[in-house]
Every structure is written in C-alpha cells, then in structure tokens.
Amino acid sequence: MAFSQVQCLDDNHVNWRSSESKPEFFYSEEQRLALEALVARGRDAFYEVLKRENIRDFLSELELSRIVEAIEVYDPGSEDPRVSGRRPEPQDNGGADASEETSAAGGPPATETLPSLEYWPQKSDRSIPQLDLGWPDTIAYRGVTRASVYMQPPIDGQPHIKEVVRKMVSQAQKVIAVVMDMFTDVDIFKDLLDAGFKRKVAVYIIVDESNVKYFLHMCERARMHLGHLKNLRVRSSGGTEFFTRSATKFKGVLAQKFMFVDGDRAVCGSYSFTWSAARTDRNVISVLSGQVVEMFDRQFQELYLMSQSVSLKDIPMEKEPEPEPIVLPSVVPLVPTGTMAKKLVNPKYALVKAKSVDEIAKSSSDKQEVTRPPGLRGPAVAERPGDLSELLPPVHPGLLNLERANMFEYLPTWVEPDPEPGSDILGYINIIDPNIWNPQPNQMNRIKIRDTAHASAQHQLWKQSQGARPCPAPCPPPAPRDSQGVVPAENGFPQGNPEPQAPVPKPRTVPVASVLARDGSDIGWALDTPEKETPQNGIDPRLPSTASESEVPQQQHSSMTQDDPDGLERGLPNGLDEDEDDDDDYVTLSDQDSLSGSSGPGPGHRRPSVASSMSDEYFEVRERSVPLQRRHSEQMANGPGHPPRRQLSAPHVTRGTFGGPLSSPLWAQGRSREDVDASRIQGQRPMDRQAQGQHFHRHGSTTSRTPGPPRFRPAADGTQSSSKKASPAAAGPHHWQPKGSPTPRMLPDPGSPRPTRNTRLRAELRATEEHASPFGIPYSKLSQSKHLKARAGGSQWAPSDSKRRARDHKEP
C-alpha cells in the first residue's frame, strides 16, 4: 500500500484533521476518492470528484497519463515467479483466454500446485533474497559525518562527477551496492565487473524494473564472460503500490540514486549512470562518510529484500579466461628512522640472541641454496610473495660512528667482594630453570663475566712470538729452573700447532684391572700407553716441567715437580698443594667446544676453553661452626691468565664458582690477605707417607698468623698441580690413572666435601650422597661436623689409619 494508506492504519491518525496549508499535510480522504474515480471510470470522473469535494487539482497531465498507463488488475497469481512475466492489461478479461495464454507462454501446467491464496499462509510462496556474497558488519558508530559536494559541470577546479564515482569503485575492497533508476554507462559497468572478477569485491546492483531492458542491452555491449557472474548480483525494483477498492493497483518508479561502498562511504544525488547525465545534463552528487552512511546501509537491505531477480542467462557470454598472474614488485626495505635504528642495535638484544647476525644470515643462505632446485640456483625473479628474498636492513647513517653502550653494567650480577688485583672476573649471571618451582643453589648455573681486554693483548703478544720463533718443534724444551725452582713466565701456545683445532672428547674411563696390574712406586706420568715409562725423576721429557701462567688457561697443561726431597721444600708457584689437582678434566656442559687440556690423549695443543669449570674449593668442617669461605688462587706467581675473547652473542652457559646470594659465602673470615699470599709462596714440609699409608688429603702445617686448625687450600680454574709420588700397590683399589692425564689420580673420600671426578664412583655414591652445594658440601650436613667426621673416618674407602689421623688434627 501507499504510505498515505499505511498512515491511516496508525492509531495516531484517528480523527486527526489537517488542512492543505499545514506542512505536515500528507494524507487526504478526498484525494483518495478522486484517485478511485480515475482508476475505475477515467479522467472525467476524476474532475467531477474534485469539484464535488472542493479540493485542488493535485495531478498534472504527465502524472495522469503515467497513472492511467500503469493501472493493472490485482491478481495474486501473477506475482508467482513461475508464471510468465507478461503483465495483464486492464482491458483483458482475465478469464479462460488469459489462462490459456499463460499455459502457452510456458506457465505452470494444470497439475502443478498454484500459489496459495490463504490470508495467513504457513509458508511463503517466494524465497527471501539473501546477500550471499557478503555484507559489512553492522557498526555501532561509523565516525564523524563528512560530506563533499560535486557539480556537473564541475566548478572551482573540481573533478567531474563520473571521475569521482569511478575512483570510488576502484578503491573498493569489500562491497559495492548500487541503486539506480537508469544504468547504461558502459565505463562504470566495466569497472564494477573488474572489481568483482579481479579483486573479488561483492557487487550488488538494483535498477528500476521499467528500465531493465536498457540495462540488459548495455550488458551485451560490455562483452561479459562467465567469470563476471561469480561476484555479481542484479535485481530490479519499483516504487510503492497504490491499491484500489476495484481490485486494481498502480506502482511508481525507483527514483533513488546512490552507491554504497565498503560500509563507510556513500555517494548520492541526481546523477544517473548514463552518458548523457555525465556529459550534457546538469547534476549534483554528495560524497558522504561517517555515521550518516548507516541510512544507506539500511535502505539498500530493505530494497534488496523486496526486489526481484534479473536473469542474465540470455546474454551471450564468452568463456571465463584464466586469471592473470599477479606479479608483486620486490619491496625494498625502507631505511628506518634514527630512533628505530638505535632500538634495533641496542646491545641488550645481544644477551637473548642464540647466534650472531652474520651466523644467522650465513645459515639461512646456505639452507636456501640447498633446498632450491638445481635449475633455480642463483638470483631469480620472485613470482610469489613467499619467494621474496629477506634482505638485511641497511645500516642507518646515524649509527655509523655511534658508540655501542655496554649493557653488562645493568645486568643483575654479583661482583666478587673485594676482588684480588689483576682478576679478570667482573661478576656472574644467574641462570635458573623455569621448570623448578623452588630452585636450590646447587640447581642454579651461572655465567662468569670476564674482562677480555687483557686476553686480547696476550693473544697479540703470542702472535708476535709465533712469528718470531723459527723452531717448529711441537713443544719447547724444558725451561731451566732458578735457584728457587720457579720457571720463568712464557706466554704463548706450543709451536707445533699454531692453529687451534677442535678437540675430540674421549671417554675418561680407564680399566681398573690395568691400573692394578701395574706395580712400582716410580711410575710417573703416563700419557700415551701404559707400556711407556717415564724417567726416574718423574718428568716426561716430551712435556715442560713447569709452565707459565699464560700457558695454563690456554693449553691446560699440568706442571710437575721433580720427585725428590728438595722439590717438596720449594714454594709452589700457583699456590697448590700436592694433593690438589686442577680442573683441566672438566668439560663445560653448555659449550661442547670448550674442552680442557687433559681431555685429549696426547700432550699436543688443545683448543683453549672459554668457559669456567666447576670450582675446586673445599673445606674441612670442624666441631665449631666455621662459615663458608671462598679461596682465590687466580692471582698466580707469573701474573693472571685470561681466556681468549669470544662473541657475546654466542651461546655460553657455564657453572660458576660459588653458590650465589642464597648460600651467602663470607669473604676471607679468619684468614687475612697476607696469610693467603704467604701460604701460596711457602712450601709444604714432607710427611712420612710410607709409614702412614696412602691418604686422600695432605695434612701439612702451614705458617699462618691466625691460630687455628689447618685448612685446605683451593685450586682455581686453569692452575697447575704438582705431582705426588705414590705407589699403586699401596693405594689399592683407590688408585686410578685416566687416559691422557699426566699424573696418577687418587679417588677422594666419599665423606670429603670435595666433589669426586670419577663417574663410576659417583654412580655408586649417588644413593648415599645428598644434593651438594657448588662447593660439594650438602647444606644439611654443614652443621653436623660429628656426623661428617664419622663418615670420613668410617667410610669404606678410607684407610685404616684415617680415624687416627683425624684425631691428630683436633685442636689442642
């Protein structure tokens, strides 16, 4: 029904009277009676009603002629899509002749069920059209409303209205909805077809049903193909209908003209998509955006719901061509801004990188060359977005001469309290396993931070010394000793192998039977085979008797003193007891490339280790509570040794030398610095080993300013160790000699706080030993000195006189 008729059914219009002079005047019962007379009896009856009701002549001659031509008999069956689209004229009788013509025109046969004539049908006779190609989501707020007005012909240098419309079509990405009374412009229609076929944009078109035939003629001129129909929907609609009491009706035309794009823009006005409207007619359009676009959204959905489909099957179309390959241009990375470039090269990112940028680029390029087919090796044009080569961003000009910040100063490190002069250890970084809820100190690893400046200088001096030495001997001859038995310092690697080679780790297990079978107290260093014997003085001629401190952290060779009484009286250059041995047989778990010097089978050059090994600090627990103390022997007689420099970005996780802030070690309580220096230089007096048997610890007297029980001295990383003359027969099953080790080693007491290095014995003692601290002492046993003594005295590995020795060392 017409809108005026719908308003009459509203409760607000009951007894509502309005005159023609008021703005709200819309519906008039007198005008309705005049239209009823026009439709039923013609124009003369129309003018008679106007005179009788004394109302204005509200229809023009053009409108009278259009209404008379548009009158049709209201027949519910004619609206069925299965019936021919021929519209019956008012002059037709609508009887049997009309039904026969309908059947002849291809209508439904008599046996087929006709549309229902029920007033409230259970099911609709027609399906509701759906926006099957997609529609933008409903947005609560679309933004601020903005409007731009364009005229035809353009004024003030504005683009013409056709250009504005075509640009909006080319910029569409989601949906284009067009409502037009007359659509015959081929250029705009081709733009819509390309948007739907090439860019997959949904295109909906609604045209006036009286102008559908002109639209179909345009489709024939556009040379469409079948691919254009995939994302195109065309429907037709008309104006509102006016129903009369004589079972007739007439309908208006679709005069709305707007285009709705992507749910956020719309263009409307008097412009129709025709050539004449863009060239000769004067029109105006408005381009709108913002919240006002919501009205166009709702209006199009309502029109689409009441519209009828337009079939394009009768239009001759070509086959769908193959889609053209989309060649994307190679995107050159833009130079980042100065602020962003500084963020990208921030040194703090080096702490979380697993590899350096050069290694990542090299590995990725090698992988691409391997996976690429042989025919495509070398530079090739990328045809797909995934084939684009990843180029490293260029260095920003602002970063060329920019000094990098040292972010290690901001790390949560624990610097050693009062470090010794010349120590290269700056601090430690905790590494805690996130899977452990409450980590203990023995479950933490640490990264030792060292100063590599001195190591670089030592490396340069070694290069200069290597270039100046003409002798290619594998090892230098034994250096002469001075009067005190101290070997002069000598920096550098052995001359035989100037290029460091990657060491090959080998098992350290040695058959015990072969060790027990050997007899003799004069057996010294066994490097290659058990059959080879060393000289009587206990020095291997292939190795130097002593080594300088610079050689120790790089070569990891163990020094040896002559097995004579005088040698025991000499001061140990590195502050080691004879019982203590260095850490050269430990391998850092996180860095497989760092191996110690004794991991190989021979005395040749090994690759220097850049990782810190397990600490050799140990203590003797007495009855009175003695706090844990850290012993330092990094300061050696010949100067501090430094490991070679390594990249900060390389993965390197090692285990530190003390338990961290949880264990709270105190620094040098009960022993002054002068006492430590004196104990490193002063030698140990020999003891009668044959009378008391072989023991695991050397109990000697040291000259100390502080009275108290004797203490064990630690062995630091990369230091030398002296030999001890012992008989394998006297040691019994506790004596073993690893392959490649320069001296026979003694199995430590299970009760000793020092961690054992024999993997086989470690497996046997795992059931009885608790989790040890980084010093090797269980935290639960630190205060139980009696129990610890009992274990040390009554252990199955302890000799028979161990208890007597423990009693000898009690405080008086």
Swiss-Prot record:
Q: Does the keyword RNA-binding apply?
A: no
State where composition is biased (Basic and acidic residues).
79-90, 761-772
> What residue stretch is flagged as signal peptide?
none
Write out the entry's keywords from A to Z: Acetylation, Cytoplasm, Nucleus, Phosphoprotein
Biased-composition ranges, Polar residues, are 455-467, 545-562
Please report the PTM annotation for this entry: BMP signaling induces the phosphorylation by BMPR1A at Ser-609, Ser-613 and Ser-615. Phosphorylation at Ser-609 is necessary for the activation of SMAD4-independent BMP target genes such as NEDD9 and ASNS.
- Locate the N-acetylalanine modifications and list their residues: A2
Major site of localization recorded for this protein: cytoplasm
Q: Where is the composition biased (Acidic residues)?
A: 576-586
Disordered: region residues: 76-119, 362-389, 455-509, 521-812
Q: Where in the cell is it found?
A: Cytoplasm, Cytosol; Nucleus
Indicate, by first and last residue, each region the UniProt record lists as having compositional bias (Pro residues). 471-480
Phosphoserine-modified residues are S4, S124, S127, S356, S609, S613, S615, S649
Mark out the compositionally biased spans (Low complexity). Answer: 589-598, 721-731
Q: Which GO terms describe its biological process?
A: BMP signaling pathway
Q: Name one Pfam family in it.
A: SACK1
* Chain segments carrying region DUF1669: 2-312
Q: Which GO terms describe its cellular component?
A: cytosol; nucleus
What top-level branch of life does the organism fall under?
A: Eukaryota
Please provide the record's free-text comment about the domains of this protein.
Answer: All members of the FAM83 family of proteins share a conserved N-terminal DUF1669 (domain of unknown function 1669) domain of about 300 amino acids. This domain mediates the interaction with casein kinase 1 (CK1) isoforms. Therefore, it has been proposed to rename DUF1669 the polypeptide anchor of CK1 domain.
According to its UniProt entry, the function of this protein is described as: Substrate for type I BMP receptor kinase involved in regulation of some target genes of the BMP signaling pathway. Also regulates the expression of several non-BMP target genes, suggesting a role in other signaling pathways.
Please give the subunit comment from the record.
Interacts with SMAD1 (via MH2 domain); in a SMAD4-independent manner. Directly interacts (via DUF1669) with casein kinase isoforms CSNK1A1 and CSNK1A1L.
- Similarity comment text for this entry: Belongs to the FAM83 family.
Question: Per its record, how is this protein called by name?
Answer: Protein FAM83G
Q: Which organism is it from?
A: Mus musculus
Q: What is the lineage of its organism?
A: Eukaryota, Metazoa, Chordata, Craniata, Vertebrata
